[in-house]
């Protein structure tokens, strides 16, 4: 099958048992056969932290200067002037109780949820829906803020969230397969630099243990 042949061809382009520099890894990713759509390139960073401990949980946002290549859809919980400003800034979904009702009904057709502080009592009731999808607004990621316009512009312009999973991995998209090597490298280094910046004081031993680049072979 053509898919099996492409897999074999790609597997011959690098040594799985050898560690590569970031430049080499980006070059390998760029050399792999592409699908008919523009695949997402993800980075998985294994960190030397214990995510079971509160003082070693890592969560935040980082600006990918080369962008993500994705059309980010934003939902904003706001009222009055803040809601008007959010619509003018290009948010796809804006509302208060009405938006909450839509989400309770199963509407989650957005990538980022932003809320003004006064809307958090309403948003907090949506934890069952938003939490498992990593869409719950949080002050640590800049998604609970009175300045919704700034947040919308940042997330549509390349800001992404990161957090450790239960295995101490951080999994973040850094661009598309169509990006140039310099753009992917810029985004990779921005993320790693941010993770180094927020290294917990309680983390002992080697902090950044392993970086892996992955082609996500599904259209987005």
Region spans (language model):
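Generic N-terminal amphipathic, Lys/Arg-enriched alpha-helix
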Residues: 2-15, 22-23
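Structural signal for hydrophobic packing residues in well-ordered secondary-structure cores
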Residues: 11-14, 18, 29-36, 51, ...
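Translation machinery proteins
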Residues: 20-84, 105, 111
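Residue-level signature of catalytic and energy-coupling elements of molecular machines
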Residues: 25, 86, 131, 213
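Flexible, glycine/charged-enriched surface loops at secondary-structure junctions
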Residues: 37-41, 198-210
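Ordered, amphipathic secondary-structure segments that act as subunit-interaction surfaces
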Residues: 72-91, 98-99, 122
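Long, charge-patterned amphipathic alpha-helical coiled-coil/hairpin "stalk" segments used as oligomerization
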Residues: 91-198
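Residue-level detector of conserved catalytic or cofactor/ligand-binding positions
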Residues: 211-220
């Amino acid at each position: 099958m053509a898919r099996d042949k492409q897999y074999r061809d790609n597997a011959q382009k690098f040594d799985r048992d050898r560690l590569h520099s970031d430049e080499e890894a980006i070059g390998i990713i760029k050399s792999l056969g592409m699908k008919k759509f523009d695949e997402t390139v993800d980075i998985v960073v294994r960190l030397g932290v214990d995510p079971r401990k509160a003082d070693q949980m890592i969560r935040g946002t980082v600006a990918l200067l080369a962008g993500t290549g994705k059309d980010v859809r934003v939902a904003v919980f706001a009222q009055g002037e803040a809601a008007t400003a959010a619509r003018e800034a290009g948010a796809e979904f804006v509302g208060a109780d009405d938006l909450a009702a839509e989400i309770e009904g199963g509407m989650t057709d957005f990538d980022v949820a932003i809320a003004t502080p006064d809307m958090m009592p309403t948003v907090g009731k949506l934890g069952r829906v938003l939490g498992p999808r990593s869409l719950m607004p949080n002050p640590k990621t800049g998604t609970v803020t009175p300045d919704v316009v700034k947040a919308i512009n940042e997330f549509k312009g390349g800001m992404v969230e990161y957090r450790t999973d239960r295995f101490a991995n951080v999994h973040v998209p850094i661009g598309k397969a169509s990006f140039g090597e310099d753009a992917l490298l810029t985004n990779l280094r921005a993320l790693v630099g941010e993770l180094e910046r927020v290294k917990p004081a309680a983390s002992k031993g080697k902090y950044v243990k392993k970086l892996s680049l992955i082609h996500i072979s599904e259209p987005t």
